[in-house]
């Protein structure tokens, strides 16, 4: 797979050489050094290089280095990286992760006290729209040229992911496509309008994409249809009308393309933790092994060095310390970079209490290494278990699932899963319990996930909504779905408390309008006809 990575990143370098940064004036944001490539005499390879910018817009912050030449202004390059921004909103605001440093705006996310002026909310909103603009530029460039139809489908899928994130986190948002001329003022669309467009767009993309595996690191039919399934799963929240039957059908379509390989023939990778290690590229689309990762972001220790992505998920969870009965060493996980600033809440840790043998938390650093479960001191890294899920280790023994230290690097080679087949199985199980799919099949599907984790299978009596929510937490933690799940189950703003929720040590409810984030005040100021979300 390393040869595939080399090719991916050589294409990305070509994109940078072409100056493919995007003209984003049609979104009235703040790009740095914007350029638009025009059609004409570009070769197919150069078109592919421009498409690479649509991909890199989700992987890195900008053109150069981990914190240099970011595509957006106002935040440092590390904080403003695409998936790190989503993590700050969808994970920091929940029970799964607490950031202990007093970074501007982050404490408000961790304690559910944010406002419309929060810089990180603005940065994440802006990052989504800069990415949308980059994809729009590419689609304008290729037009209706049939030679580049597959590339256009990929760009549309990438853009759909960003619009999905807007619908999920902000509800309403500005809307611009390649059909609008550059410089066109965005029109604000409601959550329902954006949902309807997304559904139509994704249905068309899925229908036209090939069933074949895409090239390594690219998005194909599985990824696009999984995003559609995720849209349908949350339809009742997004529109007021459930679409669990449509979600279940998408799940069945995806599963049918994967059965017969992997764990118990389910298409799942045999060893859970191998999905998040330094040579997990084999499980990516086009990776050559069991492709459980339906959509992911390719990373390489030499060529992609963001302070977001998997670097963030590794380094923030590690701290090298050996004193007073406390031990942890970042090099044990194949990395020589450690921040020690992100840990679990006790409520999150308790999700594993019923089956402590669960492999999904087997690498966490707990009491035996001097870490406490309780978040007694908010700013103390060891007051809370260290959550080790993402590593730069290498696969070793398939029978035991063991891993080994390879080359120790500052940045990981670990690719970042965006949507996995395990999520699809859990989506189907939830749809079944909500009356829109086969219950026996839903039970079988959730048990694939549980048995792979080394915990006892559920019986029919165990198949409850609460158990599905908890299983999603155990399986998908730190994969940017927790806030969305809690909102869908009615347990985000109220109905379930965790340490420091609403800024209270024991946790407290907060207003339900905060199920959505505010439209940033900077956006409202620059687009006075845009409406703010209720409550802000």
Predicted regions span which residues?
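Short, surface-exposed recognition loops and adjoining beta-strand edges that mediate ligand/DNA contacts
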Residues: 36-38, 64-91, 176-179, 210-226, ...
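Bacterial Sec-dependent N-terminal signal peptides
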Residues: 1-32
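Long, intrinsically disordered, low-complexity segments
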Residues: 22-27, 41-44, 97-100, 128-129, ...
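Flexible, polar/acidic helix-loop-strand segments at domain edges
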Residues: 97-116, 123, 343-420
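Glycine-rich, aromatic-lined ligand/substrate-binding cores of catalytic
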Residues: 60, 64, 291-380, 438
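Membrane-proximal, proline-rich intrinsically disordered regions
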Residues: 23-81, 251, 526-536
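Conserved, well-structured interaction surfaces
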Residues: 44-52, 56-62, 96-170, 186-193, ...
């Amino acid at each position: 797979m390393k040869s595939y990575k080399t090719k991916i990143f050589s294409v990305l370098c070509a994109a940078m050489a072409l100056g493919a940064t995007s003209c984003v004036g049609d979104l009235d944001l703040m790009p740095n050094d914007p350029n638009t490539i025009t059609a004409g005499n570009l070769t197919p390879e150069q078109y592919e290089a421009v498409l690479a910018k649509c991909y890199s817009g989700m992987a890195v912050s900008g053109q150069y280095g981990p914190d240099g030449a970011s595509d957006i202004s106002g935040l440092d390059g590390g904080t403003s990286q695409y998936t790190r921004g989503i993590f700050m909103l969808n994970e920091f605001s929940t029970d799964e992760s607490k950031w202990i440093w007093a970074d501007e705006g982050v404490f408000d996310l961790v304690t559910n006290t944010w406002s419309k002026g929060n810089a990180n909310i603005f940065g994440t909103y802006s990052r989504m729209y800069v990415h949308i603009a980059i994809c729009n530029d590419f689609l304008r460039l290729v037009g209706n040229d049939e030679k580049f139809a597959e590339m256009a489908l990929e760009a549309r899928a990438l853009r759909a992911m960003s619009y999905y994130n807007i619908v999920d986190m902000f509800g309403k948002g500005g809307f611009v496509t390649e059909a609008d001329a550059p410089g066109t003022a965005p029109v604000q669309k409601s959550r329902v309008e954006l949902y309807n467009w997304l559904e139509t767009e994704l249905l068309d993309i899925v229908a036209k994409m090939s069933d074949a595996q895409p090239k390594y690191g690219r998005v194909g039919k599985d990824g696009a249809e999984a995003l559609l399934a995720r849209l349908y799963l949350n339809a009742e929240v997004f529109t007021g009308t459930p679409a669990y039957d449509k979600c279940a059908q998408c799940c069945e379509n995806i599963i049918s393309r994967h059965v017969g390989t992997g764990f118990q023939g389910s298409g799942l990778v045999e060893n859970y933790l191998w999905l998040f290690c330094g040579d997990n590229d084999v499980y990516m689309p086009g990776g050559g092994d069991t492709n459980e990762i339906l959509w992911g972001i390719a990373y390489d220790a030499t060529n992609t060095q963001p302070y977001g992505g998997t670097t963030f998920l590794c380094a923030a969870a590690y701290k090298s310390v050996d004193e007073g009965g406390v031990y942890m060493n970042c090099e044990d996980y194949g990395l020589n970079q450690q921040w020690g600033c992100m840990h679990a809440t006790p409520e999150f840790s308790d999700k594993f209490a019923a089956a402590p043998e669960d492999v999904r938390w087997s690498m966490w650093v707990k009491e035996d290494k001097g870490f406490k479960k309780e978040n007694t001191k908010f700013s103390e890294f060891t007051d809370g278990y260290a959550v080790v899920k993402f590593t730069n280790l290498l696969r070793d023994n398939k029978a035991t699932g063991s891993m080994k230290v390879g080359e120790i690097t500052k940045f990981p080679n670990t690719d970042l899963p965006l949507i996995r087949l395990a999520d699809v199985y859990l989506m189907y199980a939830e749809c079944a319990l909500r009356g829109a799919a086969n219950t026996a099949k839903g039970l079988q599907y959730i048990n694939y996930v549980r048995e792979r984790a080394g915990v006892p299978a559920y019986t029919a009596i165990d198949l409850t909504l609460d158990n599905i929510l908890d299983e999603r937490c155990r399986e998908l933690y730190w994969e940017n779905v927790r806030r969305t799940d809690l909102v869908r189950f009615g347990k985000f703003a109220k109905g379930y408390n965790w340490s420091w929720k609403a800024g209270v040590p024991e946790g407290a409810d907060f207003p339900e309008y905060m199920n959505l984030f505010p439209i940033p005040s900077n956006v409202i100021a620059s687009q006075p006809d845009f409406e703010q979300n209720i409550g802000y």
